[in-house]
Amino acid sequence: MTSDVIVRPYQAADEEHLVTLWNASMWADPIDALAWRSRYLLDPSFDPNSCLVATSNGALCGFVLGMTQREATNSDAWIVGFGVSPSHRRQGIGRALFTTLEDKWRTLGIDHITVGPYIPSYVTPGVDESSYPEAIAFLEAMGATTLNRPLSMKASLTGYRPASSAVETTARLAAEGVRIRPAVPADILPLLEFLEEHFPHWRGDATSVMLELFGSDARQVTLHIAEENGTIVGYAQSRAERFGPFGVNESYRGRGIGAALLAHVLPAMRARGFHCAWFLWTSDRAAKLYRAHGFEEVRRFALMEKSLT
């Protein structure tokens, strides 16, 4: 790295240049200034000391956005995005950014880094294998390893009808006492309690959907629940064309409740006027369920991690 390159914390005046560099480096996942502010800058855990930039003769030429959960007691951290301008690559700038950030995190007791899925504001569940092969090679050179390979999927809703097997599953579940239905206001507290117990990371997403569904404008969102004898055992939500999150109480899995929820949500999304459904993250095992409803793989990611010990 040349002597004119300086690594420092993010400053307010960097916004425009950082967004421009983000879009040049992470071209498959562009953002604008509004997304930068709403997702990251205004995140309660945002710390300029974990968002480092590199400048060359005063011009921004690299960045790495790291996040920790400020109120958490664990020792985890996340790399949400990073990049170096094409004209400054292979000069050690990326390594300097990461090394500086890792050193800062070690002093805070951080001992584990995941690349990608910082909740709630992750862009992708890892590094896109097709779009960013050089980034994967760089991370491997920095000591990161691939934990698993999640995929993103998409389905057309035009002409969608639930498969006969899903209809039969819904009928069987009803006979067993499990009912799938749209959420109503009386579900707010029970659903929040269900999420707190089974899917605490998704509570914020569900709360945001319920604020619109029951408090302002329901045109962009849907929410369905699965219940047995009045007890919520599963739920599924959508916002615009994005399906999920959704989940089922672990003790109720394997009975087809997830498939039944999916078969109810997709027609509801189409009724809202949306023509496709997509989501960012699932496993190959779960993808079998989605493929039965017309979903196809559109992206494949490397979920990478690194130990700082």
Could you tell me what each predicted segment is?
Residues 90-103, 254-267, 292:
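Conserved acetyl-CoA-binding loop-helix of GNAT-fold acetyltransferases
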Residues 1-39, 51-55, 60, 150, ...:
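Short amphipathic alpha-helix that is part of the acyltransferase structural core
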Residues 79, 113-115, 243, 277-281:
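Conserved hydrophobic beta-strand within the GNAT/NAT acetyltransferase core sheet
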Residues 90, 98-174, 302-306:
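Acyl-donor-binding surface of acyltransferase catalytic domains
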Residues 254, 262-263, 267-309:
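Short hairpin/turn module used for nucleic-acid contact or packing/dimerization
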Residues 62, 148-151, 234, 299:
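A structural microfeature
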Residues 22, 26-57, 61-69, 197-223, ...:
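Active-site rim helix/loop that mediates acceptor-substrate recognition in acyltransferases
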Residues 79-89, 118-121, 246-254:
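A short, internal acetyl-CoA/4′-phosphopantetheine-binding micro-motif in the GNAT/acyltransferase core
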